[in-house]
């Protein structure tokens, strides 16, 4: 008779260094943040680099806030198992790896002295972080340079760099390379701006400011990997299969991309030499300008999501994988990507098409359940950020409307069509209707108010009201773009009369 999970846990050894055969390594990387993303992305990258090259660097994790505990890390000597699951070249792929790159985990508050000791060590060279979009902020209330530690992440970092500067008397070779992973524009530049403000606020000497400016490098980065995290439903089965208990199991997709931009203090060749990721065979791009790669990601990956998910949902699909197995929606997505988005991008066609191929594999990943309704959140602002640049770029380049991006506007308007408000999770949503089934329309109040007041009008009036609302399109009046208003009006009329499935089927057959 099989043992119950509780009995297995009692009889099972917890994952530790004796199981992983981890090698002791000098700490070269300090990582602010202990979450699933960094462990499945950055720590994985350094783990593979240790295996494939002579980098030989350990990571020390820093818990930057009071909330949470590092008990599980200490119980497992910072060892954990990572599962990468996805589609590669149209085939399922799964990789299971014991991650040994993390050598310690400390709390910036409770373990302050040890944290500072790591931050001022001879071997430290890199700092990575993922403190969320709200983490890289300047707060003048964080005004005590002697706090143990300061409250904000940039405040902590300013103090740490200052202690490092003091310990090594401003030595040029003791500067650090900072690689923030926060999802904000120009994250490295913004982090440096915050530190400069704290230097001013705290009245720190000019010598320190010069040292930061000359010998520390703040590299803007772009990260891309979907990380579902701890597999709660499968954990017991996995531990039984592996023969050890692991409370830090992490899961992510196979695809991963890190784009790292060098700064003025750090020649590109030196950055590539110090971080031998390419030698390790990893998908990391070192560049003098990360913006074209961000543009590619936003317009191809995020833009394709936004362009097809609402039409796909109204046509009867519920997640991305189903959508990709629907031949009509698959064609819709591929036509949008290859014929309407990629021609407007600054990177080479070959580079963009290779990325698009990987995106399609990611959309086919059966291990990640991308619910279309979840993706639909705030679709109006998403369309502006992700699809509008491609739409306008196409119109400018070819002097005609992009067929599928144009239809995506009509699909969005149809998805948002509702005059019924309801309370949900303490807020207000609109209630849409898909073939008799209600769904929530979630967006900012101003957006919901607009659709509540206008979506019940005639197709012509509704279309003009939406396209001429410059707040939705970055100041642009789309009602003046070629014959867009007439085309959208026809689409809205057709969708109302025949339904999304019939209209989108005809759209694909027209090619």
Question: PLM ranges: what are they?
Answer:
Residues 4-511:
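Substrate/ligand-engaging "lid" and interaction regions
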